[in-house]
Amino acid sequence: MIASLDELYHSELFFLPVMDENARLVGLEIIATFAAEDGAVRMPTELVAPRLSVEEQYCLFVEKLALLETCQHFFIQHKLIAWLNLPPAISDLLLLDSELFSRAARFPFFEVAINENYPGLNQGKNNETLANLAMHFPLILANFGAGEASTKAIFDGLFKRVMLDKNFIQQRAEMISFEPFMHAIVAQISSSCESLMIAGIDTEAMFARAAPLGFSAFQGGLWPPVPVSQLIKLVQR
């Protein structure tokens, strides 16, 4: 996809691994970076997303689905989950555009990721769009702890999975209370979702600290994103 910002940028898609406590692959998040046409500048999606039009956000989501389609046998063969972040601006389109809905719903391993800044998230199941999304797709709250939402939507049972925010984890990791605080979160949240995951695992030392705490999966710089050409290497370790 080509995005028109101060200059033209094109999207490049990568797979961000999610591992279990034994460092075995359980799923992949499809993420995007944006590169200038001359390749001299690269920006992550979170910096570019606020400047994308609704049409550009739609095109990027479709581009991710197309990549997922080319890799679907890999996901099925290795029993992996695929996560795609859904921008709020196109959440209604996913439900109302029959072609887009069909493309997404055909993958049994596909789950929709949303962030804490999703409009009306604190309304929980009273948010009609969010409730409808949860009826049709497994949802994951991708950055719990970012500080932009309450726990209502989690306790309403809208999310199959919850991922703790990487910045939240890295800030807490510096505190002596990190382990008991994580135990408290696991105890509080686990009964309201199928899987509680943790991001911000950038080192072996951090992985060793987090692995015994009761989380089902881990994500971070310890397992960097890979292009589609290197997917097979993730299951050969």
Swiss-Prot record:
Keywords: Repressor, Transcription, Transcription regulation, Virulence. Residues 1-237 form the EAL domain. It comes from the Bacteria. It holds the Pfam family EAL. The keyword Transcription applies. SUPFAM superfamilies: EAL domain-like. InterPro entries: EAL_dom (IPR001633), EAL_sf (IPR035919). Interacts with FlhD in the FlhC(2)FlhD(4) heterohexamer, inhibiting its ability to activate transcription. Acts as an anti-FlhC(2)FlhD(4) factor by binding to FlhD, decreasing its ability to bind DNA, and thus negatively regulates expression of flagellar class II operons, decreasing motility in nutrient-poor medium. Required for resistance to host phagocyte oxidase. Belongs to the YdiV family. This is Anti-FlhC(2)FlhD(4) factor YdiV.
